[in-house]
């Protein structure tokens, strides 16, 4: 998690962010969330991205810009200590509705990256873990959108986390995106 190996958490967890972003979203009690994004420049990565992050040598630290956007929370019980504003009732949008949501949010993320002159974009599996989004839906949305941005960046990479015992998210993303 980027928040564990950088100063991102401290940039996102400020009174201004709570006032403008988190508090209004929690008050909505909507596990689908909305299309808002947060662009955070100049994040310093100073720990390794391992199970137990370790401080890197100072010469190995690097700076990245981060774009934050919430994925739909499709958990059976969406509210927990980390998502206390997501309500207590599960939502069940259709795969088509979810694909539209994912495409819109991904376009916002990539538009922000273009506006801020990013040359490399690293995207995740956007909700396919803890938020229970279907990898096929998210990967298909990503493929549809990324086609329109292929020449806007030097690199578009997907970092898809998998548990050692289950690489299904990776296999789905690899299958869907391999034709790009």
Where do the language-model regions lie?
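Macrodomain-like recognition of ADP-ribose-binding/processing modules
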Residues: 1-180
């Amino acid at each position: 998690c980027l928040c564990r190996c950088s100063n991102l958490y401290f940039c996102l967890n400020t009174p201004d962010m709570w006032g403008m972003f988190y508090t209004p979203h929690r008050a909505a009690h909507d596990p689908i969330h909305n299309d808002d994004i947060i662009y955070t420049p100049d994040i310093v990565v100073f720990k390794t991205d391992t199970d137990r992050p370790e401080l890197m040598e100072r010469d190995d630290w690097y700076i990245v810009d981060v774009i934050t956007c919430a994925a739909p929370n499709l958990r059976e019980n969406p509210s927990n200590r980390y998502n206390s504003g997501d309500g207590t009732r599960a939502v069940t949008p259709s795969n088509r509705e979810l694909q539209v949501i994912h495409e819109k949010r991904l376009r916002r993320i990539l538009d922000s990256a273009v506006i801020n002159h990013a040359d490399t974009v690293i995207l995740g599996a956007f909700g396919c873990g803890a938020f229970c989004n279907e990898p096929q839906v998210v990967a298909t949305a990503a493929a549809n959108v990324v086609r329109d941005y292929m020449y806007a960046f030097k690199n578009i990479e997907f970092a898809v986390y998998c548990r050692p015992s289950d690489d299904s998210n990776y296999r789905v993303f690899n299958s869907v995106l391999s034709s790009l």
